[in-house]
Design a protein with these regions (language model features):
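Acidic, histidine-bearing metal-coordination/catalytic regions of metal-dependent phosphoesterases
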Residues: 1-109, 114-116, 121-150, 156-185, ...
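Conserved beta-strand segments of the P-loop GTPase G domain that flank and frequently precede/overlap
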Residues: 70, 109-110, 195-198, 230
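Extended active-site neighborhood of metal-dependent phosphoesterases/phosphodiesterases
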Residues: 118-228, 238-326
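Active-site beta-loop-alpha junctions enriched in small/polar residues
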Residues: 232-234
């Protein structure tokens, strides 16, 4: 980590490193357990009880808004995005024409401003200082304004750091923060509004926040005003891929505050969380739902996103089905499919993960080999599992699997290791539905156990028949350990 500028220029988070996985998992559990007892939104509402709007730009004839989400990861990516946002103007070529885009009068940060988990130290090194280096503080009166909503990574410390940075009307580089809460309402020109809501903690919207937007709808929003809504997750996608419940709280908010109180028109919903760009448009062309999580975190595939969505919008008696179609994405589908081959490099890019799997496979093999010497009755007369495997051809696959399973069941430590790896993959499975998490996670774990068996079988043949080494010789044992660490780590990392 370089410290040339008074802060650590940190690398991208290695999400697959065993230590990082453990740390993130523990903090996630702690956040889930204690988060509801440390909800800063109640405190913010008590300190600022008046439901005032956070910014009024309605008198301006033209207003440009920049948007970035999923930001504070590695220095290189974060600084690149920050420097692009700081440019006075950008010139883009499209359709044979040059379009000049001025820097936004407002910058909206759409969630997950820091990785891997929220703390002031991580914000300082991964967000504050890179943005300050890219865009130092502007002269008073000329500064662009900043608004932000928290994502799940911002919530890991109960919003303590988020509140300190974004809700004190301070500075983030050359941008001046304006809001007093983790949500905001901003009045834009030409009867438009920009609302940012906080729905991260347990997926619900707290009552003070609902009251705040209730007063905005009742007192400030006029009939047929148009609203841009910023949220931290693309719940319209999760409602299709992870169950209708994922879309429920957002449905309620939209129906209650944008349709029932006053017939305002929701025109655009902006979010991050998925690290790509995908835009869905309603069938009548009136509503855009946009995921734009390209603020610097790792790129997420787009080719698996649904081409069409049929969303149940509204709540209770006002429920209706609205159809959406995917209109644009970055990367495009072909490029996204091509980029997936980069997963083959995971054992190299995340070598700690590959090494962990190699060590796990080696340990598992050692335990089974040792246990098998006490159960020759399971090995058709062979003295050990490796001796048994080197004498089995591929045609005996079912018999080998049966023997392998019998050894595991009769070795308590092996059972515990199997439960550990299966449970680990279930815990870190990204599927929201419990049944999907169970099926995918357990299947992934079992696949690693089977890969371990296949490698033991392969190395038993290669080392004895190919190199002529005795099963119990120190040369064979040393070679086996090296093979399992190398090839187990590489193949396991890809799997």
């Amino acid at each position: 980590m370089r410290k040339d500028f008074g802060f650590e220029q940190r690398p991208m988070v290695d999400w697959l490193a065993p230590g990082q996985l453990t740390q993130t998992g523990i903090k996630s559990v702690i956040s889930d357990i204690f988060g509801s007892y440390a909800d800063k939104r109640d405190v913010m509402a008590a300190l600022h009880p008046k439901p005032e709007i956070d910014g009024d730009y309605s008198q301006e004839s033209e207003l440009w808004i920049d948007y970035a989400a999923d930001l504070g990861d590695g220095f290189d990516a974060t600084y690149t995005v920050a420097r692009t946002l700081a440019e006075p103007q950008l010139s883009l070529e499209h359709g044979g024409q040059t379009h000049v885009l001025p820097r936004g009068r407002l910058l909206v940060m759409g969630g997950d401003q820091v990785y891997p988990t929220a703390s002031f130290d991580e914000y300082f090194n991964r967000l504050l200082k890179p943005y300050e280096a890219a865009f130092p503080r502007s002269p008073q009166g000329q500064e662009p304004h900043l608004y932000a909503i928290p994502g799940n990574h911002d919530w890991y410390d109960g919003l303590s750091s988020f509140t300190r940075i974004f809700c004190g009307q301070g500075w983030l580089g050359g941008w001046k923060t304006q809001q007093r809460r983790s949500y905001f309402a901003v009045k834009l020109p030409h009867n438009w509004w920009l609302w940012g809501i906080d729905i991260q903690l347990e997926g619900y919207i707290d009552k003070p926040q609902l009251d705040y937007f209730y007063r905005q709808s009742l007192d400030n929003v006029q009939a047929n005003d148009q609203v841009i809504l910023c949220v931290a997750e693309p719940r319209w996608v999760y409602g299709v891929t992870k169950g209708a419940e994922a879309f429920r709280s957002l449905r309620y908010f939209e129906d209650r505050h944008l349709h029932q109180l006053k017939p305002a028109r929701l025109k655009v919903t902006l979010t991050g969380d998925l690290h790509h760009y995908v835009r869905y448009e309603s069938k009548d062309g009136e509503v855009q739902r946009i995921t734009a999580g390209g603020g610097g975190a790792y790129l997420f595939a787009t080719h698996g996103m649904p081409e069409k969505l049929a969303l149940e919008e509204g709540f209770k008696e006002s429920v209706r089905t609205v159809e959406y179609e995917k209109k644009a994405s970055f990367p495009d589908t072909a490029t996204s499919k091509l980029l997936t081959f980069g997963s083959l490099l995971i054992p190299i890019r995340s070598w700690k993960f590959g090494l962990f799997l190699g060590v796990f496979y080696t340990l598992f093999s050692w335990i089974l080999q040792s246990a098998s010497k006490a159960r020759p009755d399971l090995l058709a007369g062979s003295r050990s599992l490796m001796e048994y495997l080197q004498g089995q051809s591929l045609g005996n696959g079912p018999r080998v699997l049966k023997t392998f399973a019998a050894l595991i069941v009769n070795t308590p430590v092996s059972v515990l290791l199997c439960l550990l790896i299966v449970g680990g993959f279930m815990a870190f499975c990204s599927a929201r539905r419990k049944i999907a998490r169970f099926v995918i996670g357990s299947g992934h774990g079992v696949a690693h156990v089977l890969l371990n068996l296949a490698l033991m079988w392969l190395f038993a043949h290669v080392n004895t028949h190919g190199f002529g080494l005795g099963i119990d010789s120190w040369r064979q044992v040393t070679l086996f350990v090296l093979e399992m660490l190398l090839f187990g780590g590489l193949l396991g990392g890809v799997l």
